[in-house]
């Protein structure tokens, strides 16, 4: 069995040569399994997805790491395609992986043994292989739970998924205790022990980080059944895991990148640590210069820094880097759609939304709404050249709505509600629908990095404002539209540093609260924006008061959960406390 280093000195040609020369192993112990799975991981990151699967397949029912790696790739594929047969394949393979891991676990294992209620098992009661089986079993359980939610909407599956997540969480906590005890006794010194440590840091880090993001009302409920989340603990565990040399180091890196480049923006206030993201990505850009996943994150960081032109080039490079997983192309199309939207190149943005609506199954309702919204920003003569009918597109949206884990997708519900204006024989046009969706996705935080583009967006908003003020035919939507325009205008002014003018816009929305008929979300979101404005002015108490008003005084409005995530992040920052309940694994 050839040893494959996961150091940065190996280039992509080396990985390909090594793969071509590697024989199918005649036996597979833990050390050999880790070496071969490292090879498969390198192939995967180098766009050799099928080769990675083929390397793992022969031992997928005999080795815990081959089982985990093989099933994880298929689960990723199913999550990206959303094809029922792919989801079923992912579930079947993950069941087999769980069975493989179960065979290697110690009987009466860490979580399930009744004796553990009295005394915990320590690491020296388990062999190295049994310790790794626990970690791999926990990872498989998490993925199986996620697929359970996607596959079927019924409550039984939802409960089953929740139980799997809790079991996985408990295993990670017990493994953390085993690792801490063994490390304190100087027993964590072999390479396989370091690999176990990497698994613990990934699991404890990811669980704590993701749980810490949850609004306090949700977290209080989860704490009642044994969950807790501490953001700083989560970040520190992931950083330590990312800086190590275990097979899971790259998984820690990707988790941190996802947090910094997506979660912080969509579910937070947009204060992403891009310097850390760039530092984490740099060695992998050198090691996998054409790796599509690595290129994707490099381009995403460029977007968040306002370097839209550079991001577009990198996304195009990502697209041409591989043709096997088209779903990575779809991720690029989504980002390119926003890149062009930020620059108000509505026609090019529409083209990417059109590609998504035809090729991707992730959220047809969102893609078709985006198409119609983007076309709505264009002159009628330009729309005619596309051959599209805006009204017909909006009318399609409701029929395309889907459910995941028994719940409608919030952005789809929002799109459906907005589209209902077009159901009647005399539809009332939406006002600035593409900019409204940009706000929903926190895109103004990104545009705000570029004063020139923010000024251009402000001009578009002010034109819409004048048109509404001069409207001779008053509709039932007029007050809502005027409030939307003032909210968007205020956000632009805030990013341009014109805080007093922004405050006037926000207050105008709040004063119009009783006149709003449909878009009730505008009021709590405006209170939230005012709170952020006062934070920027240094008025901490006023900022907290306004954000607490958004949190406590409104309910049952569109995108409520998304705002509560952002409120949680903002209040935690203002109050100087960790975004969590500060607990350590126990």
Curated annotation (Swiss-Prot):
Pfam families: Iml2-TPR_39, TPR_8
Position of the signal peptide: none
GO biological process: one example: lipid metabolic process
Keyword terms: Lipid metabolism, Repeat, TPR repeat
Keyword Nuclease: no
InterPro entries assigned: Iml2/TPR_39 (IPR019412), TPR-like_helical_dom_sf (IPR011990), TPR_rpt (IPR019734)
Keyword Lyase: no
SMART domains cross-referenced by the UniProt entry: TPR (SM00028)
TPR repeats: 292-325, 483-516, 524-557
Family: Belongs to the TTC39 family.
Role of this protein: May be involved in lipid metabolism.
The protein, known as: Tetratricopeptide repeat protein 39B
Organism in which the protein naturally occurs: Xenopus laevis (African clawed frog)
Gene: ttc39b
């Amino acid at each position: 069995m050839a040893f494959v280093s996961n150091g940065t000195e190996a280039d992509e040609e080396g990985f390909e040569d090594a793969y071509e020369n590697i024989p199918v192993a005649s036996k597979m112990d833990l050390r050999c399994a880790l070496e071969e799975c490292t090879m498969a991981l390198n192939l995967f990151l180098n766009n050799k997805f099928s080769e990675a699967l083929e390397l793992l397949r022969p031992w997928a029912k005999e080795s815990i790491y081959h089982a985990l790696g093989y099933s994880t790739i298929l689960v990723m594929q199913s999550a990206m395609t959303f094809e029922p047969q792919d989801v079923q394949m992912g579930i079947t393979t993950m069941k087999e992986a769980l069975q493989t891991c179960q065979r290697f676990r110690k009987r009466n294992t860490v979580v399930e043994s009744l004796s553990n209620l009295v005394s915990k098992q320590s690491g020296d009661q388990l062999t190295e292989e049994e310790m790794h089986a626990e970690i791999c079993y926990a990872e498989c359980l998490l993925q199986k739970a996620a697929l359970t939610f996607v596959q079927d909407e019924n409550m039984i599956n939802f409960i089953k998924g929740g139980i799997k997540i809790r079991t996985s969480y408990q295993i990670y906590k017990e493994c953390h205790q085993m690792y801490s005890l063994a490390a304190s006794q100087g027993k964590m010194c072999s390479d396989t022990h370091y690999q176990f440590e990497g698994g613990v840091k990934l699991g404890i880090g990811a669980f704590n980080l993701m749980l810490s993001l949850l609004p306090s009302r949700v977290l209080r409920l989860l704490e009642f059944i044994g969950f807790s989340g501490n953001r700083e603990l989560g970040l520190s565990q992931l950083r330590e895991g990312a800086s190590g040399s275990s097979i899971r180091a790259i998984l820690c890196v990707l988790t941190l990148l996802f947090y910094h480049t997506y979660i912080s923006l969509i579910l937070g206030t947009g204060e992403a640590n891009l310097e850390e993201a760039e530092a984490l990505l740099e060695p992998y850009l050198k090691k996998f210069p054409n790796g599509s996943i690595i290129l994707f994150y490099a381009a995403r960081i460029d977007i968040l820094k306002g370097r839209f032109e550079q991001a577009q080039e990198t996304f195009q490079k990502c697209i041409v880097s591989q043709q096997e997983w088209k779903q990575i192309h779809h991720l690029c199309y989504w980002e390119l759609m926003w890149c062009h939207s930020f620059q108000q190149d509505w026609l090019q943005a529409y083209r990417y939304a059109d590609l998504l609506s035809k090729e991707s199954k992730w959220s047809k309702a969102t893609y078709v709404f985006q198409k119609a919204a983007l076309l709505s920003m264009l002159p009628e003569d330009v729309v005619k050249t596309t051959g599209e009918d805006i009204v017909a597109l909006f009318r399609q949206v409701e029929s395309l709505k889907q459910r995941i884990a028994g719940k409608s997708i919030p952005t789809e519900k929002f799109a459906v509600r907005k589209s209902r204006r077009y159901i009647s024989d005399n539809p009332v046009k939406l006002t600035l629908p593409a900019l409204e969706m940009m706000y929903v996705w926190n895109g103004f935080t990104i545009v705000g990095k570029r004063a020139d583009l923010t000024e251009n967006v402000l001009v578009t908003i002010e034109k819409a404002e004048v048109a509404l003020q001069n409207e001779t035919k008053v509709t039932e939507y007029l007050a809502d539209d005027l409030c939307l325009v003032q909210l968007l205008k205020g956000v632009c002014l805030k990013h341009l540093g014109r805080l007093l003018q922004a405050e006037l816009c926000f207050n105008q929305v709040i004063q119009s609260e009783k006149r709003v008929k449909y878009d009730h979300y505008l009021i709590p979101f405006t209170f939230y924006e005012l709170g952020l404005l006062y934070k920027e002015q240094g008025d901490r108490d006023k900022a907290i008061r306004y954000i607490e008003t958004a949190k406590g005084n409104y309910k049952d409005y569109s995108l409520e959960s998304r705002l509560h995530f952002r409120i949680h992040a903002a209040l935690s920052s203002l109050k100087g406390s960790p975004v969590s309940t500060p607990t350590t694994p126990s």
